[in-house]
């Protein structure tokens, strides 16, 4: 079951990053500017962020498995249509619909893991799912780049039809049903509980870290890519992608978070992850050596991979019975951070250079390190 949840999380979230290597291809194919072509990614991201909050709340009412399966089935229908469009407006519209469909999965799978696995295994399972989320940022780009080099951009989406169909079958037949709350009240009743997350002491503080982690992660990818493409290194976009791929090594630590949390506690593991990420980010720009940069990028991604599962576990523990809503808001804040990351990084690069950008992002991680000290943990809620 863990392998299925890992696989489905990877292929769903990879769709967020598919169009990053395709921007110039879309610009040429549809005769639009690169900034307009970037809307193929932005439309997905905005729909994914908003939809995650909406559907995560509904999973409380209708069940986690139903929401995961519905999302995958809709992806199976919508995704191949994207490959067949001849209008850029339709491309953007269908990518937005794809984002809404994909947004049904992440908050549901995280809430499912928290409910269906015993406490001792919970952080480990969340670690595997978090690893899939993090790896998706690289795997999605590598996949679409490989397909475009060998076929055409349309096949990026045609092939995913089969991937999502197989994933739907796996969820339908090999994943047991989760818990479903009794549907009391109207359809909109669950949404009235969103305000409850701000009444739980510590949850709003957790969301500061949620945003900061992904401002740093996406800012890291943006700044590192520009840095390696500069005259100092002169790497091609394909070479840069492989440098980023090395970061997967650091992400592989996430499944071991459960053992670390059991031994040291969730807050200590979270702080340790933030320290690792801050050190890796802070040292990145100090020495313009490719091997050193790659090494520090692994340190950085190791820190993120340690911090993210611990943070999700902490949110679930504080939230208790409203964990689905709490995790949905976490995903919303994650994508707010992911949207702000490139904007902040480009601004900092233009006004202060690469070293300055790395240090500011490291500073954000260091500031977020203070936050866990203001979070008090009570006995775990059911």
Task: Name what the model sees in each region.
Residues 31, 63, 84-90, 118, ...:
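Helix-breaking motifs and short loop linkers at transmembrane-helix boundaries and internal kinks
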Residues 50-86:
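Conserved MFS/SLC helix-loop-helix module at the cytosolic interface between two early adjacent transmembrane helices
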Residues 90, 119, 128-175:
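Helix-loop-helix hairpin linking two adjacent transmembrane segments in secondary transporters
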Residues 1-34, 55, 220-226:
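Extracytoplasmic
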Residues 267-311:
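C-terminal transmembrane helical hairpin of 12-TM major facilitator-type secondary transporters
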Residues 94-135:
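Cytoplasmic helix-loop-helix junction between adjacent transmembrane helices
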Residues 176-207:
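Juxtamembrane intracellular "pre-TM" segments in multi-pass secondary transporters
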